[in-house]
From Swiss-Prot:
Cofactor detail note: Binds 1 dipyrromethane group covalently.
Gene: hemC
NCBIfam families membership: hemC (TIGR00212)
Source species taxonomy: Bacteria, Pseudomonadati, Pseudomonadota, Betaproteobacteria, Burkholderiales
A Pfam family reported for this protein in Swiss-Prot or TrEMBL: Porphobil_deamC
Family statement: Belongs to the HMBS family.
Any one of the GO BP annotations: protoporphyrinogen IX biosynthetic process
Protein name per UniProt: Porphobilinogen deaminase
């Protein structure tokens, strides 16, 4: 496709809304470069923005409003026309988009695993009792408490560079990060070990980039279509369906990961208490050819988790989080 074959109504300029962290800008530039290659006559620009999630660094996301803190400002730019599309790490996108917005494209996935990063130790198993390990998510915290109760797990906020700086100055013996971000920024050498998905099930959408637009922008959706990876989209749709059905958010240690094995999509979902004392898991697979198939697969896994008691865990955690937010207001 070239500019001569594009519908006349499509704009000559596209503006991408992005957070201003180094990783977020890399992701936006990745999309910009792909669009420029597809449409060299189009002027593709990036609008860097600071979100509320970037500004609140003294509390965990579960205590200040969750994943929506990273996308609301970008959605405002889509709504008022300052931007045509917004690029997100899909794991940071709420399971239910606000009315008036749509996920137009999901790009091919980077490594979805969690990474162990340390200057002094080769793995989680090598850490001594009482070693301080930093993590930004309740999901990883629950995993660490379940598998490594001897460790001192503490919150870790800030962008990727800030987290690494906190490790380097000695605040933590080790930290757990998404492997995808490290690899995208050329920091794979910082990874001491990659955690197997059986040991640390990733968050829904981890490693995938999602491109959001204002609903009704069929022109922008058409331009983004070549960037859409169908296999990745079905996998993350199934993952997000698990979280959506259970009301998953930053308040809940909920994980979901789907992988293709031949023509079958294999999905695993997990819910746990924050202390790791109780961990529920469910699996299912299907020949998911459509988004509806992926949704059904996700629902099968969420239904099984509910049969195991996941709803009671989720409801208790959401209630506790609401009380904590009320108390801190």
């Amino acid at each position: 496709m070239n500019s001569e074959t594009l519908p006349a109504e499509l704009p000559a300029t596209l503006t991408i809304a992005s957070r201003e962290s180094r990783l977020a800008m890399w992701q936006a530039e990745h999309v910009r470069d792909a669009l420029r290659k597809l449409y060299p006559a189009c002027d593709v620009k990036i609008l860097g923005m600071t979100t509320r999630g970037d500004q609140i660094l003294d509390r965990t996301l579960s205590k200040v409003g969750g994943k929506g803190l990273f996308v609301k400002e970008l959605e405002s730019a889509l709504a008022d026309g300052r931007a045509d599309l917004a690029v997100h790490s899909l794991k940071d996108v709420p399971m239910e988009l606000p009315a008036g917005f749509a996920l137009a494209a999901v790009m091919s996935r980077e490594d979805p695993r969690d990474a162990f990063v340390s200057n002094d130790y080769a793995s989680l198993d090598a850490l001594p009792a009482g070693a301080v390990v930093g993590t930004s998510s309740l999901r990883r915290e629950a995993m660490l408490r379940a598998r490594y109760p001897r460790l001192d797990v503490r919150p870790l906020r800030g962008n990727l560079d800030t987290r690494l700086a906190k490790l380097d100055r000695g605040d933590y013996a080790a930290i757990i990060l998404a492997a995808a971000g490290l690899k995208r920024l050329g920091l794979a050498a910082r990874i001491r070990a990659l955690l197997d998905v059986e040991d640390s099930l990733p968050a829904a959408g981890q490693g995938a980039l999602g491109i959001e637009i204002a609903a009704g922008r069929a022109d922008v959706a058409a331009w983004l279509a070549p960037l859409h990876d169908h296999a990745t989209a079905l996998a993350v749709e199934a993952e997000r369906a698990v979280s959506r059905a259970l009301g998953g958010s930053c308040e809940v240690p909920l994980a979901a990961h789907a992988v293709w094995r031949g023509d079958e999509l294999h999905l695993t979902g997990s819910v746990s208490t924050t202390d790791g004392a109780r961990v529920l898991a469910a699996r299912a697979q299907s020949r998911a050819a459509t988004a509806a198939d992926a949704l059904a697969l996700g629902r099968a896994v969420s239904d099984e988790l509910e049969r195991q008691g996941a709803r009671a865990i989720v409801d208790a955690l959401v209630a506790a989080s609401a009380q904590a937010q009320k108390g801190g207001a």
